[in-house]
Amino acid sequence: MLDVHFGAGNIGRGFIGETLADNGFKITFVDVNDTLIDELNKRNGYTIELAAEGQKHIEVHDVKGINNGKDPKAVAEEIAQADMVTTAIGPKILKFIAPLIADGLKLRQANNNTTPIDIIACENMIGGSQSLKKSVYESLNEDEQAWADQNAGFPNAAVDRIVPLQKHDDPLFVSVEPFKEWVIDKSQMKNPKIQLKGVDYADDLEPYIERKLFSVNTGHATVAYTGNMKGYKTIGEAVKDDSVVDQAKHVLGETGDLLIQKWGFDPEVHHAYQKKILSRFENPYISDDIERVGRTPIRKLGFNERFIRPIRELKERGRDYSALVDTVGEMFFFNYPNDSESVKLQQLLKDEPIEQVIRETTDLKDEDLVNEIKAAYEKHLAAAK
């Protein structure tokens, strides 16, 4: 079987690629990074290291690469014969690869290939595959859309594995934590015959996506932003500070309250899940930079993102969200010149009053929440002086 995977980066190779290879798939990685594509084509394999005691190595074989910037036609031809398409490129990039996927579907139609294919966005976002579908359909006419409705599925997915920023002499070598979770919405699949081992299938994915987003992503970002306020540069340094861990525990307590109320998760099971998350952040074999975990703060301040959405929903339920608001106040101090959103955020803070910056970045219309975030920001500002 063949999977066309968009994104030859660390997550693509170290998580999605490993799982697919373990299921006997050949993988064609699609990327614009010449170095990665050239090495994949030269070696047809790469090594994954598990960041844990023993540092076990896993060898992945039967892979190749296509540079979509140089040879988009080859990408379409590969999709035309693929059994599955996956992505791990970041939510903002999905719309840019959509025309390539559309071309692949057009070619499948032209070749009368009616074998159903699922196209799965493995991104940190709610409704990733369905969002990708909308972008793909913009490049299809009515007849092509009708054909795709019958033959192409876009099942949403929830993915979870910490893959830190890293540099190695071997550009394909990647280190990942042992824990991994990949859940696919089986109700949206067109080819349910493909059942991957190491992947869970659910009728309703939203509880899993929110559990992951509001626990792992919110918790990890909390450690980054709180650690940043205290001058730490790595997550490893930050989690040695009890005050940082306490902040993460308070935040996870609030998001856990929401998740248990909203989705009916078993409290005991969920608290064990939260404990496991904190232990993953404390993994001594993973050296993750605060800059990587905290990057793109404007996106992370979004209305439906990891902080503002749980804040809104907790307020609606009359529950406590004070630790979440406190962390959002810290986000405005994230200042890394290599991160364009961080630079933009700092410029906004110079040009506009804080309450206007809060409204712009969060899309909040609730002035009480805007003022609560403003108060948190001003508290941190006073403490920093």
Curated annotation (Swiss-Prot):
<dbReference type="InterPro" id="IPR013118">
    <property type="entry name" value="Mannitol_DH_C"/>
</dbReference>
<dbReference type="InterPro" id="IPR013328">
    <property type="entry name" value="6PGD_dom2"/>
</dbReference>
<comment type="similarity">
    <text>Belongs to the mannitol dehydrogenase family.</text>
</comment>
<protein>
    <recommendedName>
        <fullName>Mannitol-1-phosphate 5-dehydrogenase</fullName>
        <ecNumber>1.1.1.17</ecNumber>
    </recommendedName>
</protein>
<dbReference type="InterPro" id="IPR023028">
    <property type="entry name" value="Mannitol_1_phos_5_DH"/>
</dbReference>
<dbReference type="GO" id="GO:0008926">
    <property type="term" value="F:mannitol-1-phosphate 5-dehydrogenase activity"/>
</dbReference>
<dbReference type="InterPro" id="IPR036291">
    <property type="entry name" value="NAD(P)-bd_dom_sf"/>
</dbReference>
<dbReference type="InterPro" id="IPR013131">
    <property type="entry name" value="Mannitol_DH_N"/>
</dbReference>
<dbReference type="Pfam" id="PF01232">
    <property type="entry name" value="Mannitol_dh"/>
</dbReference>
<dbReference type="GO" id="GO:0005829">
    <property type="term" value="C:cytosol"/>
</dbReference>
<dbReference type="InterPro" id="IPR000669">
    <property type="entry name" value="Mannitol_DH"/>
</dbReference>
<keyword id="KW-0560">Oxidoreductase</keyword>
<keyword id="KW-0520">NAD</keyword>
<feature type="binding site">
    <location>
        <begin position="3"/>
        <end position="14"/>
    </location>
    <ligand>
        <name>NAD(+)</name>
    </ligand>
</feature>
<dbReference type="InterPro" id="IPR008927">
    <property type="entry name" value="6-PGluconate_DH-like_C_sf"/>
</dbReference>
<dbReference type="Pfam" id="PF08125">
    <property type="entry name" value="Mannitol_dh_C"/>
</dbReference>
<dbReference type="GO" id="GO:0019592">
    <property type="term" value="P:mannitol catabolic process"/>
</dbReference>
